[in-house]
Amino acid sequence: MSRAQSSPTVIQWVIDTHPLWPSALKTKDLTSAASRALSLLTEEEQSSVLRYYHVRDAKLALASALLKRYAISRFCHVPWFQAKTTRDSRTKPVFVLPSGDEPLIFNVSHQAGLAVFLAVRDPPKGLAVGVDVVCPSERRDRDLSSLEEDGWASFVDIHADVFGAGEVSALKSMNPVPTVQGRDRALRYFYALWCLREAYVKMTGDALLASWLKDLEMHKFAPPEDMKEAQEVRLRGKKVEGVDVRLMPLLEEYMVSTAIRNGDNGERVELGEFQSLDMEEILAFGEKASKP
């Protein structure tokens, strides 16, 4: 079946790296504890993984690299070590065939031990994806301490340069009561907004220093438990059409946002649930797909 006749396939994966390679207490320990996984990467990729100071970051980098190779090799039917990503003109990782086609578009995000992968196989022309994951509890103690010392308005001001003016006003208007419960709820709104914006920006492929970032607004943003309707995105005050931006809970402590831009002719793809992926499945596939 030719690509033109193929229907798009949405891929939504998540890997929890916390239980992986438990004997690796330092990054250098991965050379033995994760030798099987590392052997499925090029020397350049291995060096990129092992340069991280914290082993938790190295494990996430390793899982992310394997996720991308697995998806490309499996869904594009290419040998494992030919499943290489390059960077486009905006430095976004892509997989491009010699013909110039992109049979798989994808985006990866990782935070607090979790790697999240969103991709579309055989995407219609113009379709784009972005994904971001946040873990509000990861910085909870530090955030609560900051709120106790400096207050909510000051906390928002510290991060105001990465949000739109309307978003800053919306955050400040929350003015949470000075209780742990009230501050926790406000922080969930803060991280929900952060996650939504990141996914959208990653979808566009533009850098975080894009000139339009201050003109971007997630209108009436909310964490998953308070989100009543589809997320509306505005740019310079006007609603952005043809983009589906969502926020959903993941496991117990995470939120994940997906941003999908319709194809040039309005084609849409349907999201499902994120599926937990077993590292053994990736390694077994990689070993088989890397054999001559």
UniProtKB/Swiss-Prot annotation:
Which lineage do the record's taxonomy fields give for this organism? Eukaryota, Fungi, Dikarya, Ascomycota, Pezizomycotina
Gene Ontology MF terms: holo-[acyl-carrier-protein] synthase activity; magnesium ion binding
Catalyses which reaction(s): apo-[ACP] + CoA = holo-[ACP] + adenosine 3',5'-bisphosphate + H(+)
According to its UniProt entry, one GO biological process term is: lysine biosynthetic process via aminoadipic acid
Enzyme Commission designation: 2.7.8.7
* PANTHER family per the UniProt record, alphabetical: L-AMINOADIPATE-SEMIALDEHYDE DEHYDROGENASE-PHOSPHOPANTETHEINYL TRANSFERASE (PTHR12215:SF10), PHOSPHOPANTETHEINE TRANSFERASE (PTHR12215)
Q: What is this protein called?
A: 4'-phosphopantetheinyl transferase 1
Organism from which the protein derives: Fusarium mangiferae
InterPro entries linked:
4-PPantetheinyl_Trfase_dom, 4-PPantetheinyl_Trfase_dom_sf, AASDHPPT_N, P-Pant_transferase_sf
The text of the family note is: Belongs to the P-Pant transferase superfamily.
